[in-house]
């Protein structure tokens, strides 16, 4: 006699339970995405009161705009730097804390603190340190013979926003990496050491494959963070300058949509950014996930 399968007394109850989540998805994702897609094929006046269907004209104009193509390239470079540097530094810090026996709680607390700081505040903090006239780091660099002014030097401006963005995200990555490292059975590491594997070999051949699911998850999260959540950092630190050197796609959407009131162009840029993020996510799940060991 097989046990009875548990179920709901009312056939409509499962749909009622998922209704709030479906409503949130429809209101905050599907509806805005649909409106952006519709506006991207229209020409709207600055107040959105009149429109004219223009098809793919907005997209064609974007890819003929050298400033938009430059922001596209800037976004790719910026995202790769933020995700790559952030993940590697966070993993290194988590590995160091995992090996520390005394005072590990203190190290964990200090490394988690930046996560409580708002992105705009993090940007202001680094601006104070790198201020051309009053910054402590600027004065230290001047004594070494290096002149710093991120308001005039595009490379320095990019360095500043990458540094602030990475510093803000390190705490989030650190928490996941540390939890993954501490979940590895010590017996496996000890067995590898007994077999003659050194610390470096144990880390790359044993530890790194075991935490690959967490690494893959953080890779996706950090790319999304670099594409979207770094907007306050860029806005507070450089305002997209100098000469649009730090203008990413999300910041260009804001500048043209909210500051320039070019709703059609900003909608088309939003659609392109959405497709870009979806494409990168699909590529990661299609190819990168193959190397993940669950």
From Swiss-Prot:
One of its GO terms (biological process) is transmembrane transport. Residues 1-11, 102-109, 179-207, 284-294 are cytoplasmic. The keyword Membrane applies. SUPFAM superfamilies: MetI-like. The keyword RNA-binding does not apply. Keywords: Cell inner membrane, Cell membrane, Membrane, Transmembrane, Transmembrane helix, Transport. It is found in: Cell inner membrane. InterPro entries: MetI-like (IPR000515), MetI-like_sf (IPR035906), UgpAE/MalFG_permease (IPR050809). Its main location: membrane. It holds the Pfam family BPD_transp_1. The chain crosses the membrane at residues 12-32, 81-101, 110-130, 158-178, 208-228, 263-283. It is a multi-pass membrane protein. One of its GO terms (cellular component) is plasma membrane. Residues 33-80, 131-157, 229-262 are periplasmic. Residues 72-284 form the ABC transmembrane type-1 domain. NCBIfam families: PRK10561.1. Part of the ABC transporter complex UgpBAEC involved in sn-glycerol-3-phosphate (G3P) import. Probably responsible for the translocation of the substrate across the membrane. The complex is composed of two ATP-binding proteins (UgpC), two transmembrane proteins (UgpA and UgpE) and a solute-binding protein (UgpB). Belongs to the binding-protein-dependent transport system permease family. UgpAE subfamily. This is sn-glycerol-3-phosphate transport system permease protein UgpA. It comes from Yersinia pseudotuberculosis serotype I (strain IP32953). The gene is ugpA.
């Amino acid at each position: 006699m097989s046990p009875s399968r548990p179920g709901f007394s009312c056939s409509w109850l499962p749909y009622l339970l998922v209704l709030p989540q479906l409503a949130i998805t429809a209101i905050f994702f599907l509806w805005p995405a649909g409106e952006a897609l519709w506006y991207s094929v229209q020409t709207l006046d600055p107040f959105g009161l009149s429109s004219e269907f223009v098809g793919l004209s907005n997209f064609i104009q974007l890819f003929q705009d050298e400033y938009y193509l430059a922001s596209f390239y800037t976004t790719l470079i910026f995202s790769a730097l933020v995700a790559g540097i952030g993940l590697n530094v966070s993993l290194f810090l988590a590995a160091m804390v995992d090996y520390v026996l005394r005072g590990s709680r203190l190290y964990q607390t200090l490394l988690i603190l930046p996560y409580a700081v708002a992105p705009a505040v993090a940007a202001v903090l680094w601006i104070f340190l790198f201020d051309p006239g009053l910054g402590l780091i600027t004065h230290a660099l001047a004594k070494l013979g290096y002149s710093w002014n991120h308001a005039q030097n595009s490379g320095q401006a990019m360095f500043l926003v990458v540094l602030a963005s990475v510093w803000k995200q390190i705490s989030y990555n650190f928490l996941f990496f540390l939890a993954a490292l501490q979940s590895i059975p010590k017996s496996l590491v000890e067995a590898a050491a007994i077999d003659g594997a050194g610390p470096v070999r144990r880390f790359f051949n044993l530890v790194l494959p075991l935490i690959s699911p967490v690494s893959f998850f953080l890779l996706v999260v950090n790319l999304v963070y670099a594409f979207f959540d770094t907007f306050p950092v860029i806005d507070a630190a450089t305002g997209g300058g100098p000469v649009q050197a730090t203008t990413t796609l999300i910041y260009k959407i804001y500048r043209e949509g909210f500051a320039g009131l070019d709703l059609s162009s900003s909608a088309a840029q939003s659609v392109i950014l959405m497709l870009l993020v979806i494409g990168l996510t699909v590529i990661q799940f299609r190819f990168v996930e193959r190397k993940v060991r669950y």
